[in-house]
């Protein structure tokens, strides 16, 4: 039973309300159905009941939308997660009033449970004074209880809606924050990608800059290299131009080709002896007609080549130029010379001691030329000699040609090539012609009183079968027809000029033919036969001038000058190399230099040794053209 209170009594003193709200709260926590329906019913109930609760004309001051009711707050605190379920429970409560009443009755019987709820209602709702306290306490007014339940449900619904709105706002805020975070995350990723792209672009740009710098540096280096190459090309062009200019200035003369017939050589030798005879007669005041003989004497050469008669020149070339050619020939001839023992043996020249020397070959030659010309008016002295004995002239001519044969033998030494023989013949003839021209321009008038000694010292050999010299009658008649002073003057001039000529010829011919294997004896024959005079010291010791044999025919001169042998250590090194390379025994220039350094020999000695070794040390082969190295391959005049 509820206690009855006075109307003036405050609601907080002893007012007790039925524990319907507590039951409803418990039911709200247990019901989970019909969310939307309950909410709509609450709105309808609120619209019907109004804003304030009037119980029996008394304004209780309770508003279902007041934010200060503790019941709604309690429900909000307990039902944050189940707002919709509370609305459904309210609907169930509205529909089942009888059950609620029963529950209220049951709750009234348990005051302990209702004390807390009543206190909360007293705090929130204020004092509720009613004139019908007994009826209210007794629970007879069912309408008032329904209203209270409706207001409480409405308050609960409002609180639930507010909670829902708050939750929705929180959810929206959370979603917005999440979206902002996601957007910031997206933007940060994009920024990172942009930064990475910028870094890649910068790295590519730096690489491109480095490549451009490398290309520029390579271009600079290429330009510098091209500039250097252009400078080298210009220098090479200058060198080529200079070398071509020097080559044109030092171009070697073409060899003078002589005819192969012995008559051509004899004719050239005739002209040489004619020049000698004419040189002996240049300064005779009474023999002016002999000058015509000088003008008529011509050197017979091949039709395509002519020798100029100017002093010191041959074919437009200077004397020094021709002597340099002869020096080249000398160096070439050393390539053929051998250092072996069989070449050191003396070579004997066959001779016939039954013939006395012909003392007047020059006059015989002069007489022969006068017989060929038949100029009786211009050559009176020679014609007087020719009228006495024609046989003497013929014999003298034969003797002369025989003596010239030794010259042909000396000149016409046949090396391995025809060109070399032509070169030697041309060089010898050019050298002789130079000295004859020199002697023509340098005639002297020195006096010597040894005319008879000169004729006795003239040495010459003749291969004719006559034992008596055929020139004596003509020589005597020639001497008888001339005055003594003229004969003496002529003999003095002849002796002086021939001595000068012989000395100069001996110096040049011996140098050009000293290193040749076959030219030493032939050059000595050339001196003895052509020039026909020796010094008094060269005669034999017995004092017999008629039986004097020329110095070139003695054994000491005929014997070849012995060459020095190479050291045994050097030859052993060279032989070792030769036997190791016997299939191709031709060392290169670098190998020759190396061998020369190792053996302490000269480059020329190495060349000579290998040329001899290929001929004598290695076995001979049939084809020498293939096996042997060609002569004058490096210093040929034709190059």
From Swiss-Prot:
Question: Carries keyword Transmembrane helix?
Answer: no
Compartment(s) where it occurs, according to its Swiss-Prot or TrEMBL record: Nucleus
Q: Which CDD domains match?
A: homeodomain
Molecular function per GO: DNA-binding transcription factor activity, RNA polymerase II-specific; RNA polymerase II cis-regulatory region sequence-specific DNA binding
Compositionally biased residues, Basic and acidic residues: 345-354
Q: Kindly give the InterPro entries that the UniProt entry links to this protein.
A: HD, Homeodomain-like_sf, TALE_homeobox
**Signal peptide residue numbers:** none
Report any one BP term from Gene Ontology: cell development
Keyword annotations for this protein?
Answer: Coiled coil, Developmental protein, DNA-binding, Homeobox, Nucleus, Transcription, Transcription regulation
The terms describing its cellular component in GO are:
nucleus
Q: Does the keyword Transcription regulation apply?
A: yes
Source organism, top-level taxon: Eukaryota
Q: Which residues form a coiled coil?
A: 72-109, 152-184, 230-296, 365-396
Tell me the segments the record calls region Disordered: 1-45, 66-144, 157-179, 262-313, 331-422, 436-547
Q: Which residues bind DNA?
A: 559-621
Q: What Pfam families would the database entry show?
A: Homeodomain
- Renumbered to this chain, the Polar residues biased-composition regions fall at 405-422, 532-547
Biased composition regions of type Low complexity, renumbered to the chain:
73-119, 126-142, 266-300, 358-399, 436-526
General function of this protein = Putative transcription factor.
Q: What is this protein called?
A: Homeobox protein 9
Origin organism is: Dictyostelium discoideum (Social amoeba)
Q: What is the gene called?
A: hbx9
């Amino acid at each position: 039973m509820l206690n009855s209170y006075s109307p003036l009594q405050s609601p907080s003193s002893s007012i007790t309300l039925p524990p319907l709200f507590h039951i409803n709260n418990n039911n709200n926590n247990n019901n989970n159905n019909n969310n939307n329906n309950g909410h709509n019913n609450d709105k309808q109930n609120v619209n019907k009941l109004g804003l304030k609760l009037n119980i029996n004309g008394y304004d209780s001051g309770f508003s279902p939308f007041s934010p200060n009711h503790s019941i709604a707050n309690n429900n909000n605190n307990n039902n944050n997660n189940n707002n919709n379920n509370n609305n459904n429970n309210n609907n169930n409560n509205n529909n089942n009033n009888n059950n609620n009443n029963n529950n209220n009755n049951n709750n009234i019987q348990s005051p302990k449970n209702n004390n807390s709820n009543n206190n909360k209602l007293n705090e929130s709702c204020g004092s509720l004074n009613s004139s019908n306290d007994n009826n209210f306490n007794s629970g007879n007014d069912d309408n008032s209880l329904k209203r209270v339940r409706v207001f409480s449900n409405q308050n609960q619904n409002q609180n639930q809606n507010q909670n829902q709105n708050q939750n929705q706002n929180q959810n929206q805020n959370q979603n917005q924050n999440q979206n902002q975070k996601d957007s910031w995350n997206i933007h940060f990723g994009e920024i990172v990608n942009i930064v990475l792209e910028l870094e890649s672009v910068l790295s590519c740009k730096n690489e491109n800059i480095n490549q451009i710098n490398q290309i520029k540096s390579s271009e600079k280096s290429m330009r510098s290299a091209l500039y250097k190459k252009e400078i080298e090309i210009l220098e090479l062009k200058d060198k080529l131009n200079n070398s071509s200019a020097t080559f044109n200035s030092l171009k070697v003369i073409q060899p003078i080709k002589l005819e192969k017939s012995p008559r051509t050589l004899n004719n050239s030798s005739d002209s040489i002896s004619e020049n000698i005879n004419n040189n002996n007669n240049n300064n005779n005041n009474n023999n002016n007609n002999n000058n015509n003989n000088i003008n008529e004497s011509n050197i017979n050469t091949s039709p395509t080549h002519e020798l100029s008669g100017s002093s010191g020149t041959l074919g437009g070339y200077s004397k020094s130029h021709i002597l340099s050619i002869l020096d080249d020939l000398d160096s070439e001839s050393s390539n053929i010379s051998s250092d072996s023992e069989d070449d050191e043996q003396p070579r004997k020249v066959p001779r016939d001691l039954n013939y006395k020397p012909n003392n007047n070959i020059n006059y015989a030659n002069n007489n022969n030329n006068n017989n060929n010309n038949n100029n009786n008016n211009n050559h009176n002295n020679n014609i007087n000699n020719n009228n006495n004995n024609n046989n003497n002239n013929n014999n003298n001519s034969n003797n002369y040609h025989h003596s010239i044969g030794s010259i042909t033998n000396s000149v016409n030494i046949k090396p391995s090539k025809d060109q070399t023989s032509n070169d030697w013949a041309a060089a010898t003839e050019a050298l002789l012609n130079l000295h004859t021209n020199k002697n023509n321009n340098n005639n002297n008038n020195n006096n010597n009183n040894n005319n008879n000694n000169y004729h006795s010292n003239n040495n010459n050999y003749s291969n004719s079968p006559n034992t008596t010299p055929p020139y004596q009658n003509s020589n005597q008649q020639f001497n008888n027809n001339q005055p003594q002073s003229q004969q003496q003057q002529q003999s003095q001039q002849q002796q002086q000029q021939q001595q000068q000529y012989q000395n100069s010829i001996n110096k040049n011919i011996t140098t050009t033919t000293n290193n040749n294997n076959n030219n030493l004896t032939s050059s000595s024959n050339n001196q003895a036969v052509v020039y026909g005079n020796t010094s008094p010291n060269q005669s034999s010791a017995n004092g017999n001038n008629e039986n004097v044999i020329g110095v070139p025919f003695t054994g000491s001169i005929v014997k070849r000058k012995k060459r020095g042998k190479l050291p045994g250590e050097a030859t052993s090194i060279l032989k070792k190399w030769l036997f190791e390379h016997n299939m191709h025994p031709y060392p290169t220039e670098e190998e020759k230099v190396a061998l020369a350094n190792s053996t302490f020999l000269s480059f020329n000695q190495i060349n000579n040794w290998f040329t001899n070794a290929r001929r004598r040390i290695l076995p001979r082969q049939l084809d020498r053209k293939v096996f042997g190295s060609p002569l004058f391959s490096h210093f040929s005049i034709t190059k």
